[in-house]
């Protein structure tokens, strides 16, 4: 498992190593060394007057592995593959922000792993870190620990893809990095990752600011 905040060049090849034509357009992501400043401000004028956020820490252990018969060259392609979770998620509704944001954080920062098997393209990453999540009270689990494991099958370019995701979160008294800092780690080419707010909407999770300027998660009300 690779650490979320590991400095230096991680082991294993990246997509950039094999296909330089994607370096300036949309490369598969690799771990950066520092988060960029938040430049995009998300507002929800209808609700932010009522939003009360609190921040809690969790010891998060999460790992994601994707195995595809065809290479997945672009971040947008990987996100399309991972999007199968939208329909297949069957974990906690209230704590979905913790589980899914960790899933997307790793998913946008996967590493291509070396493989000696033909037509077997493996991508993996994960972390064990104390992570802080900010949001409304309902996103924070009442239980001391929550776990979620999921195995999914989907396709890419007409060929099968398997996805294996393991997540556990345990309440911690320690301070840690905010999950938004983790998600916003710069890409291998120095650019920013895709807009997390847009990715979360399909999961009925909102990322917004309240009147105090706090940036946090809320669960969208089902219509």
From Swiss-Prot:
Membrane topology: Peripheral membrane protein
Lineage top rank: taxon: Viruses
Main location: virion
Residue stretches of biased makeup (Basic and acidic residues): 14-23
Comp. bias regions, Basic residues: 1-10
Any single Gene Ontology cellular-component annotation: viral envelope
Region (Disordered): 1-23
Signal peptide location: none
An example Gene Ontology molecular-function term: structural constituent of virion
Location of this chain's protein in the cell: Virion membrane; Host endomembrane system
Keywords from the UniProt entry: Apoptosis, Host membrane, Membrane, Viral envelope protein, Viral matrix protein, Virion
Subunit structure, interactors included: Homomultimer. Interacts with nucleoprotein and with the cytoplasmic domain of glycoprotein.
Note: Most abundant protein in the virion.
Function summary: Plays a major role in assembly and budding of virion. Completely covers the ribonucleoprotein coil and keep it in condensed bullet-shaped form. Inhibits viral transcription and stimulates replication.
The name this protein goes by in its record: Matrix protein
Upper taxonomic lineage: Viruses, Riboviria, Orthornavirae, Negarnaviricota, Haploviricotina
Gene coding for it: M
């Amino acid at each position: 498992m690779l650490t979320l905040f590991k400095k230096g060049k991680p082991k294993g090849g990246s997509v950039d190593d094999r296909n330089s034509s994607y370096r300036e357009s949309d490369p598969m992501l690799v771990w950066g060394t520092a988060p960029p400043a938040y430049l995009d401000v998300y507002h929800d004028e209808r609700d932010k007057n009522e939003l009360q956020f609190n921040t809690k820490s969790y010891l998060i252990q999460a790992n994601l592995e994707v195995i595809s018969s065809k290479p997945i060259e672009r971040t947008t392609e990987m996100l399309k593959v991972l999007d199968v979770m939208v329909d297949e998620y069957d974990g906690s509704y209230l704590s979905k922000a913790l589980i899914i944001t960790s899933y997307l954080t790793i998913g946008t920062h996967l590493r291509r792993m070396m493989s000696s098997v033909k037509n077997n393209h493996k991508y993996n990453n994960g972390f064990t870190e104390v992570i802080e999540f900010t949001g409304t009270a309902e996103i924070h689990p009442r239980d001391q620990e929550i776990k979620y494991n999921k195995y999914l099958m989907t396709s890419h370019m007409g060929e099968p893809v398997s996805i294996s995701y393991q997540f556990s979160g345990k309440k911690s008294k320690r301070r840690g990095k905010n999950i938004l800092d983790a998600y916003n780690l710069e890409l291998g080419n120095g650019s920013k990752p895709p807009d997390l707010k847009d990715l979360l909407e399909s999961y009925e999770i909102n990322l917004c600011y309240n009147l105090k300027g706090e940036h946090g998660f809320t669960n969208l009300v089902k219509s």
